Amino acid sequence: MKNSEKRGRKHKRQDASSAENAGGEVKEASANEASLPQSPEPVSASEANPSPSRRSRGRGKKRRLNNESEAGNQRTSSPERSRSRLHHSDTKNGDCSNGMIVSTTTESIPAAPSWETVVKVVPSMDAVVKVFCVHTEPNFSLPWQRKRQYSSGSSGFIIGGRRVLTNAHSVEHHTQVKLKKRGSDTKYLATVLAIGTECDIALLTVTDDEFWEGVSPVEFGDLPALQDAVTVVGYPIGGDTISVTSGVVSRMEILSYVHGSTELLGLQIDAAINSGNSGGPAFNDKGKCVGIAFQSLKHEDAENIGYVIPTPVIVHFIQDYEKHDKYTGFPVLGIEWQKMENPDLRKSMGMESHQKGVRIRRIEPTAPESQVLKPSDIILSFDGVNIANDGTVPFRHGERIGFSYLISQKYTGDSALVKVLRNKEILEFNIKLAIHKRLIPAHISGKPPSYFIVAGFVFTTVSVPYLRSEYGKEYEFDAPVKLLEKHLHAMAQSVDEQLVVVSQVLVSDINIGYEEIVNTQVVAFNGKPVKNLKGLAGMVENCEDEYMKFNLDYDQIVVLDTKTAKEATLDILTTHCIPSAMSDDLKTEERN
């Protein structure tokens, strides 16, 4: 792509706390919490009158998505990938819209739950609670600030050990979480014990003993079969009391989890999952929980398609927390692989007619398996289970599933036996499994974003939340092409590698001529490669050369007088009411 093209942000669309992202009730947080659905928070002056447009170098738009995940990646039967939309049944980060999801086609009314099924579910319904959360999200575009707080409502349910399960996106960036039991007028303060972003599950508890009185925990059932009846219970939009919808299991496969930006086992059901249902349990006909409602599909040709987190994923999350006293995540095999369905391809790789498997294309440099596996190895089996040429393994009678399911059943730090074919020789390796280290992480949790400012240049690291903050929900089409390429294909070469960019330039006399530099990667400083933001901040702070030279992407350079630039920084910070030239984590690390 030509260097003469400008890079930058587009005009931001009005987001209103991203209420459109996935339904649910959203209201401004206040001391007086109204129980009725209210309007999304108003547009701020900056949102209503965006700054001058900065043209992007993104891909051409093909469709509009309401969420950070594409329906085409869900492997559903959607005939038109360009029009389908996946939604949290609550909303992004728990933010909920107070509007119903409307389809252009006439939706059929789901059948009412049978009396026998309802009777069996009734004892478990008392364990279903309503979750009230106040969120305060970081401002990734202005990392020294936080966004205006907002509140959301979703569902949850009580399990053993005085704990409550709900969705991770329902309590992400929480500042306060309260729970209310069925038939109660009291809201109890809750503590978040763990948040699993990949699996979209959060674990809560309540210290008040009164909350646990007179309620029995929900019991988990086995993985349901296709066409098994399910009843979804929760507190969706449209009322304040508990709601029950019913349907059947219509599909079971590896799904893209919208919030987690990962792929795990999921159930597709035809029971209605509406805004506010997030975190609510799905019961079988015996009154046992077989899943957690978490997202739905919006498509003009789709009706009543909801998705449920199944019990194997839930149990993995709970056992992971109990085993490590924290959530460590779902391990992955750090490879990219290719199907071996073509017979000529198999012969060229030295495979016998009876051998099946998948070819390794690339290996994550930070993954433990990079020490033993090599590109073009053929993975024949994982932990004794043979892998087919299309990458599937036997699941249940008459069913097959992607072999990533086998990996997701493991825990971080577990070992797995991998059999590979290399140069017509069969080899076996014991591999220690670990979580995925992404160059551009899907989530930044537990701390505000890092930043560093000198001479008005705002340096920060790129993450998916940052891209979404800069370019909106359609960042995959509007962000600069080079950032998107790194997001989709780049692999971190070390565990501490980060993608550092000039986010923006706060205009001052010292940076005349550099004002249009926006979201451009910093490649080197004074001839030394920039590995991460901490390293860049350290080099700038300790620079004693006459000039500071920043090498940027697209072969751009920035040269500043070192003494003048450092002196001008304080005035720029004062002008823009920025409390510090760097985030607290960089200060702490530098002192250490």
From Swiss-Prot:
User: What does UniProt note about where in the body, tissue by tissue, this protein is expressed?
Assistant: Expressed in roots, cotyledons, rosette leaves, cauline leaves, stems, flowers and siliques.
Ranges annotated as biased composition (Basic residues): 54-64
Compositional bias (Basic and acidic residues):
78-93
Q: Which GO terms describe its cellular component?
A: nucleolus; nucleus
Per the UniProt record, which EC number(s) apply here? 3.4.21.-
* Positions of the catalytic residues: H169 (charge relay system), D200 (charge relay system), S278 (charge relay system)
Name the GO terms of the biological process aspect. Answer: proteolysis
Q: Where is this region: Disordered?
A: 1-101
Where does the PDZ domain lie? 334-414
> Locations of Polar residues compositional bias?
68-77
What does the record say about induction? Induced by trans-zeatin (at protein level).
Keyword list (alphabetical) reads: Hydrolase, Nucleus, Protease, Serine protease
Q: Where is this region: Serine protease?
A: 141-318
Q: Which Pfam family is an annotated match for this chain, by its short name?
A: Trypsin_2
- Tell me where it resides: Nucleus
Question: By its UniProt entry, which InterPro entries does this protein fall under?
Answer: DEGP_PDZ, DEGP_PDZ_sf, PDZ, PDZ_sf, Peptidase_S1_PA, Peptidase_S1_PA_chymotrypsin, Peptidase_S1C
Query: Cross-referenced SUPFAM superfamilies, in alphabetical order?
Result: PDZ domain-like (SSF50156), Trypsin-like serine proteases (SSF50494)
Q: What is annotated about its quaternary structure and interactions? A: Homooctamer formed by 4 homodimers. Interacts with ARR4.
Free-text function comment from the UniProt entry: Serine protease that degrades the two-component response regulator ARR4. Regulates ARR4 stability by targeting ARR4 in the nucleus for degradation. Acts upstream of ARR4 and regulates the activity of ARR4 in cytokinin and light-signaling pathways. ARR4 mediates the cross-talk between light and cytokinin signaling through modulation of the activity of phytochrome B.
What's this protein's family per the entry?
Belongs to the peptidase S1C family.
Instruction: Identify this protein by name.
Output: Protease Do-like 9
